[in-house]
């Protein structure tokens, strides 16, 4: 658990590893998936709270946002703490002294701002022993809380605990590692480290030469990265082990993964390690395979057992690697992951293999099989980051599901030696996720109990019925936003399903969805939804982008339609928080009920706003000509051919020039020209056409999210893209 103030020691500890890594060729590129990918990187933005773990963002039951991070340094006077931050989102959160400085009222030694007693008396701490003859380690165990989850049944906070214990076990400069889990029943003020979760396959006793008879030992399992998967109902934990030269330092780093049903709440015995292609080994003491990318040298995604670490093998690390008895550092070491809804894939960002390097991204479509493919890297943007995490840039509170553009955070040893920063990363694809629905149809949204979502008659409220009645208020139309999220409009009223996105009330468990017109500039983040497939049933969860909560329906009083945390089990605790909610309440089927109102617009049309038609001035055939509006005259330069795309957007080509309506330069800026250009299929030539309340349509650029807008009702008014103001100059009739 090296920190910014401990870098000199860290550098010495890792020197042998870096020297060995420098002599190892970089891994071969992964076999290309069916799609091709592009990775764009924005300008770095400082992150002002870097420390010795990644930040772990989460939302409490009342909608309050938190993130948590820790440090546990080795010297007698060095800091050891579990810190908590709170605020509107990641950008505004500040350290909560009420939680971070809390002291256990039953034990004055048990503190969040000094975890020395807690770590030494935890399940791992009581098994640990102090270093002998090594003054650098003042304690027998150092523990970091990292990886948070809030129990939907009780509201209790859970977290995984990384232990570094029994330091210098063979007279070296390292230690053993293990992962425990902890629970807080008072919103983080006091904690109980309950038990082991994931531990080494090998002995962690000091000087155990029977287990480690030769030149090396394994320091065990640590540096966990938790992912709570809404699709499968499992926790997945990516973690690492290191192979240490006795009397020296670590010289190799291996990657592993374990999983447990979320319903088991991190308990000992619920975890299974990935070993030899199966979830077959217990989390505590079980064997584990080293993970590698699927590429020309591996089709399985893991190191064969015969080539993985075995303490019975003699020789140094480099000798074992040369003999094929040990893999080199895994390219997937301590990988944090997220679900990218635009790609329809899980993506991961591991630690660099050979020091400072571009950040690599890997992807898989199935966490059950753990086959990760390299899809690209950040090019000129490089770092040697110790700690990384994802965040959806639209909500700035959630790391579980992200859109096409997301934040990639770095803490410690970032680009140019920065201690902390993030960049906006955009992963483009030649084959993004296919829409799970036909956007030309309307759908009935029903849960596993058969209840049907409806807009309440004459109201902005939503409700659910025990069975469908055939009312149009029970039908919903999905429109892709172009970034992996969708807006969901009631087929009868055209209003969008959502939750308030301006306060924590919209994130609170049980928040009731309502319908409303789109916000200024388009759907608010509370009116955006991710459609996440449920792998076990073939159904879906609708995850609200603002809150991270999922849509559920119930016959219980007061919760006919609500948003709650993902669950794959039925609450049996008796707690009012869980309220006996079941998985069936939020596992949804989407059944077509007919065509979406207005139907598809494929074919030739005119477009008019404020009585003036969209016009290709002077019958131009020149790419780059800015479009205008003009008195309708029936000319071919005022005819536009709509071609529907697979995501529901339209390519709009002039009937005379055959050139496409195009946001000039793919600009995201308000006021950018809308021109005609050779049709390329780019997102800046795709337009989302949506019925507007009060009549007409909005025509929104898929690339920028801004609306097709004419400057005035005068002939020759120039057409640009602008934020949605509700103006008649942005409301188009389609003839």
Predicted regions and their residues:
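Conserved hydrophobic/aromatic positions in well-ordered beta-strands
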Residues: 180-182, 258, 338, 360-365, ...
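Lectin-like carbohydrate-binding module/patch detector with strong preference for beta-trefoil
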Residues: 433-735
């Amino acid at each position: 658990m090296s920190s910014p103030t401990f870098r000199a020691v860290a550098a010495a500890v890792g020197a042998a590893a870096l020297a060995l890594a420098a002599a190892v060729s970089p891994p071969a590129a992964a076999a290309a998936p069916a799609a091709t990918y592009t990775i764009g990187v924005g300008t770095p933005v400082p992150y002002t709270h870097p420390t010795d773990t990644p930040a772990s963002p989460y939302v409490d039951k009342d909608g309050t946002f938190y993130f948590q991070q820790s440090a546990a340094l080795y010297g007698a006077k060095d800091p050891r703490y579990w810190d908590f931050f709170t605020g509107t989102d990641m950008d505004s959160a500040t350290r909560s002294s009420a939680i971070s400085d809390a002291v256990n009222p039953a034990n004055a030694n048990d503190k969040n701002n000094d975890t020395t007693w807690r770590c030494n008396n935890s399940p791992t701490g009581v098994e640990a022993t102090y270093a002998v003859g090594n003054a650098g380690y003042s304690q027998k165990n150092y523990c970091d809380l990292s990886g948070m989850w809030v129990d939907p049944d009780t509201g209790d906070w859970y977290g995984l605990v990384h232990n570094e214990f029994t330091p210098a076990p063979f007279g070296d400069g390292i230690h053993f590692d293990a992962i425990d889990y902890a629970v807080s029943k008072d919103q983080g003020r006091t904690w109980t480290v309950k038990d082991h979760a994931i531990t080494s396959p090998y002995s962690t006793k000091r000087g155990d030469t029977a287990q480690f008879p030769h030149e090396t030992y394994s320091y065990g399992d640590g540096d966990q990265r938790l992912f709570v998967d809404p699709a499968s109902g499992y926790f997945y934990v990516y973690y690492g082990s290191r192979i240490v030269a006795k009397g020296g330092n670590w010289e190799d780093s291996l990657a592993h993964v374990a999983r447990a049903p979320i319903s088991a709440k991190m308990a000992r015995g619920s975890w299974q390690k990935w070993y030899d292609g199966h979830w077959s080994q217990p989390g505590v003491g079980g064997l584990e395979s080293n993970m590698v990318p699927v590429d020309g040298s591996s089709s399985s995604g893991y190191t064969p057992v015969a080539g993985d670490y075995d303490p019975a093998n003699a020789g140094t690390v480099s000798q074992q690697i040369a003999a094929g008895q040990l893999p080199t550092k895994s390219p997937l070491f301590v990988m944090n992951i997220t679900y990218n809804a635009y790609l329809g894939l899980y993506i991961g960002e591991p630690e660099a293999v050979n020091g400072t390097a571009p950040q690599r991204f890997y992807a898989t479509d199935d966490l059950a099989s753990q086959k990760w493919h390299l899809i690209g890297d950040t090019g000129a943007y490089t770092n040697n980051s110790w700690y990384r995490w994802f965040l959806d840039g639209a909500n700035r509170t959630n790391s579980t599901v992200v859109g096409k553009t997301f934040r990639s955070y770095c803490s410690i040893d970032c680009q140019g030696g920065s201690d902390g920063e993030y960049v906006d990363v955009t992963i483009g694809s030649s084959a993004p996720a296919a829409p799970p629905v036909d956007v030309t149809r309307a759908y009935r949204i029903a849960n596993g109990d058969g209840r049907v979502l409806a807009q309440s008659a004459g109201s902005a409220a939503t409700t659910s019925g025990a069975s469908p009645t055939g009312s149009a208020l029970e039908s919903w139309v999905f429109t892709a936003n172009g970034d992996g999220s969708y807006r969901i409009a009631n087929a009868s009223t055209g209003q969008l399903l959502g939750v308030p996105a301006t306060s924590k009330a919209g994130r609170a468990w049980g928040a009731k969805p309502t319908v409303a017109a789109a916000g200024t500039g388009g759907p608010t983040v509370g009116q955006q939804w991710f459609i996440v497939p449920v792998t076990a049933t073939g159904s879906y969860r609708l995850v609200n982008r603002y809150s991270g909560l999922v849509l559920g329906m119930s016959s219980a009083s007061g919760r006919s339609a609500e948003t709650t945390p993902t669950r794959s089990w039925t609450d049996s605790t008796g707690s009012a928080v869980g309220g006996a909610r079941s998985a069936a309440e939020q596992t949804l089927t989407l059944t077509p009920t007919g065509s979406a109102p207005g139907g598809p617009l494929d074919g030739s049309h005119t477009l008019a706003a404020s009585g003036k038609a969209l016009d290709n001035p002077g019958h131009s055939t020149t790419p780059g000509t800015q479009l205008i509006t003009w008195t309708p005259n029936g000319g071919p330069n005022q005819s536009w051919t709509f071609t529907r795309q697979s995501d529901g957007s339209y390519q709009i080509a002039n009937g005379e020039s055959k050139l496409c309506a195009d946001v000039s330069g793919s600009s995201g800026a308000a006021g950018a020209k809308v021109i005609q250009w050779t049709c390329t299929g780019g997102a800046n030539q795709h337009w989302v056409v949506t019925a507007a309340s009060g009549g007409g349509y909005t025509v929104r650029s898929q690339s920028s999210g801004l609306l097709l807008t004419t400057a005035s009702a005068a002939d020759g008014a120039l057409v640009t893209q602008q934020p949605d103001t509700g103006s008649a100059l942005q409301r188009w009739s389609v003839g």
